[in-house]
């Protein structure tokens, strides 16, 4: 009898693959039997040197009874700031499988929702109406939390007018795919404030510094920045702040970390509340609540932060009345 070596090798490989799949399936069943929850964390960029948002999310889950390393496994995936990788990573988490997937950012939320149709999703989106029609009853397999950034853009423009009454030409800095509604809202209110709006689409890629330089050619008098995930990732907030100070451009943002980096002013939700609320949504799903029954939660805590050191560097005197209303003034 003649034995074919190639056939034996293929047979062994198939057997090994089968045993591997069986072992993985057995391990998953054992985890379920032991009451171990599996949560998918899908991040556009990261992980950075510091992960305050992940730490807040994990700590809140622990307070709610889900402790990593004890009865919780967090499967993490990172897209290296490439949106074209989100769908594949979302599918990978769904097939792992996990009990629920959490992702952040409007574009990432949209890609994940388009890919994953059965695994429960909790999303952090600045514009939730791109995903659902009704915040109270989102339906389907998706719920989440919104920082209400889109709705707050006109308010930020009003604060800019109050801080610098003479400003008229404002550049709306954004990722076009993440902020279709925000720019229109801002355009609608600008004439009432005596302002004209232009838009600059920034991708936050390796050519970010070159993209910033193109802004100067349009000669804006101020920048209104929409917080895309990539634009919010280290070191881009610092690069944006350095560019704006050098170009003598005041900037208005949605989140305080831009102002900590040197931006002029921010008004928006506190990110700690956002990630704590997201963790609470995840915990409810782990306990058996269907995402369609969980209203998308809106931020309730907002803060105004002004960097007076930056204002002085720009030659701007912020009105005392505005400084007194700020939650924090950086000197």
Region spans (language model):
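Short hydrophobic alpha-helices and adjacent helix-cap/hinge residues
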Residues: 1-331
């Amino acid at each position: 009898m003649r034995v074919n070596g190639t056939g034996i090798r293929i047979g062994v490989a198939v057997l090994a693959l089968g045993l591997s799949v069986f072992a993985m399936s057995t391990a998953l069943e054992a985890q379920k039997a032991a009451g171990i929850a599996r949560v998918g964390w899908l991040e556009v960029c990261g992980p950075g040197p510091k992960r305050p948002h992940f730490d807040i999310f994990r700590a809140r889950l622990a307070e709610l009874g889900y402790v990593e390393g004890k009865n919780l496994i967090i499967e993490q995936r990172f897209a290296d700031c490439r949106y074209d990788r989100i769908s594949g990573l979302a599918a990978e988490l769904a097939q792992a499988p996990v009990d629920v997937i959490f992702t952040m950012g409007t574009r990432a939320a949209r890609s994940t929702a388009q890919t994953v149709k059965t695994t429960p999703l909790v999303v952090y989106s600045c514009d939730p109406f791109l995903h659902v029609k009704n915040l109270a009853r989102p339906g389907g397999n998706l719920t989440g939390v919104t920082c209400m950034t889109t709705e707050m853009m006109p308010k930020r423009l009003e604060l800019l007018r109050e801080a610098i009454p003479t400003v008229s030409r404002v550049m709306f800095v954004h990722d076009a795919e993440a902020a279709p509604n925000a720019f229109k809202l801002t355009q609608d209110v600008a004439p009432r404030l005596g302002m004209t709006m232009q838009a600059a689409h920034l991708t936050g890629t390796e050519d970010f510094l070159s993209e910033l330089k193109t802004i100067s050619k349009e000669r804006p008098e101020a920048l209104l920045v929409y917080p895309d995930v990539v634009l919010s990732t280290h070191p881009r907030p610092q690069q944006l702040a350095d560019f704006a100070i050098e170009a003598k451009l005041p900037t208005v943002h949605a989140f305080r970390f831009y102002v900590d980096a040197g931006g002029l002013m921010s008004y928006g939700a506190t990110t700690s509340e956002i990630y704590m609320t997201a963790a609470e949504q995840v915990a409810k799903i782990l306990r058996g609540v269907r995402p369609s029954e969980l209203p998308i939660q809106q931020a309730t805590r907002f803060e105004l932060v002004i960097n007076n050191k930056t204002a002085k560097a720009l030659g701007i005197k912020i009105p005392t009345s505005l400084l007194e209303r700020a939650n924090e003034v950086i000197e």
